[in-house]
């Protein structure tokens, strides 16, 4: 796997998808020493299960452990810290990590109980987990989801779980963006495998999951987050820590130089009906046998339009899904390759939310 590769797979079987990504990554070429220490860093920000859209699916963690152990790697740890005020141990319990640890003989490291090393980048000094700093190969397992303060969280921000609680508080005092970039300049992931199966629409605690049935992998955390932002309909300027991390040499945000490798096509599993805060967005759509990946991107695009008071400009429902294949109707508007016969249509399988936003804005400008 090259530094500019982004490998994507679609489906609903997290374990199978993870194995497909690992096969494509060729992890043995990245970690030739079978005695290397490997840390898995999921997102367990709060003690809720993955169906909430907040936390990493444990099936992904299990699949990685089994894959690595099958290749002869034995020195594996799961390392995480819940946010300030919540219990990592409860997050481990709720999501079955205690049993995972026992079954696979993989230690759980609660960063809240770890020792720390002070690291300084610029004028920002932080306390970083000794376990994370000493590991030979760090696999970051973030959830791509919305965030109430930084708009989005993925690879770069998930590293905040490697800090002491004191440093987490300090990060919020400093406004998050500069500290997040600085943290990744101290230690960023060697490999990122993103859980983008059903991340929350706009809140890191979950509660409004949007099913997209997608996972992707990258070596460059900055490129990973740049791609994730485009999937959720954000411009880079909306998430300052991405370009701040780039300026510190963490990686590149230039998606034009990314090598996108799609392992399979999105499946035709019917997407879940939006609930909660996302339900009003679904009222602007007309799905017919839509794939979750495509429909989820549309929901994110509509959310971005709503945030800038442009949702009201959409006068006709947006068609989406395989049910529109072969249909020719000059009066309808659609997104995705399946709607190419409609009067106005955006191609792509699936199109990214950022492209949907531009298309929908152009309709009404």
Region spans (language model):
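N-terminal and secondary-structure boundary signal
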Residues: 1-365
């Amino acid at each position: 796997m090259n530094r500019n590769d982004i490998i994507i797979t679609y489906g609903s079987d997290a374990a199978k998808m993870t194995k497909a990504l690992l096969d494509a990554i060729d992890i043995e070429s990245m970690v030739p020493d079978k005695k290397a220490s490997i840390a898995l860093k999921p997102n367990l920000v709060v003690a809720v299960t993955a169906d909430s859209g907040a936390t990493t699916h444990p099936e992904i963690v299990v699949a990685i452990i089994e894959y690595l152990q099958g290749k002869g790697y034995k020195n594996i740890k799961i390392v995480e810290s819940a946010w300030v005020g919540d219990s990592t141990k409860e997050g481990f319990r709720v999501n079955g990590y205690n049993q995972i640890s026992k079954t696979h003989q993989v230690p759980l490291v609660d960063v809240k109980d770890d020792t720390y090393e002070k690291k300084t980048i610029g004028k920002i000094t932080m306390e970083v987990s000794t376990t994370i700093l000493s590991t030979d190969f760090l696999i970051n397992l973030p959830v791509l989801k919305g965030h109430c303060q930084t708009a989005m969280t993925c690879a770069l921000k998930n590293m905040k779980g490697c800090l002491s609680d004191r440093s987490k508080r300090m990060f919020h005092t400093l406004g998050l963006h500069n500290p997040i970039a600085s943290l990744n300049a101290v230690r960023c992931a060697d490999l990122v495998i993103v859980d983008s199966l059903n991340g929350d629409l706009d809140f890191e605690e979950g509660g409004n999951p949007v099913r997209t049935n997608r996972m992707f992998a990258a070596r460059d955390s900055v490129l990973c987050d740049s791609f994730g932002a485009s999937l959720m309909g954000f411009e880079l300027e909306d998430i300052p820590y991405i370009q701040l991390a780039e300026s510190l040499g963490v990686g590149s945000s230039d998606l034009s130089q990314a090598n996108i490798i799609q392992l399979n096509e999105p499946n035709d599993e019917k997407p879940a009906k939006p609930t909660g805060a996302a339900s009003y967005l679904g009222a602007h759509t007309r799905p017919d046998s839509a794939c979750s990946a495509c429909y989820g991107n549309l929901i994110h695009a509509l959310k971005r339009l709503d945030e800038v008071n442009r949702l009201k400009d959409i006068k006709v429902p947006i068609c989406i899904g395989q049910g529109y294949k072969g249909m020719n109707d000059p009066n309808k508007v659609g997104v995705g390759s399946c709607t190419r016969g409609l009067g106005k249509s955006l191609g792509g399988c699936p199109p990214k939310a950022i492209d949907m936003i531009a298309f929908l804005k152009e309709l009404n400008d």
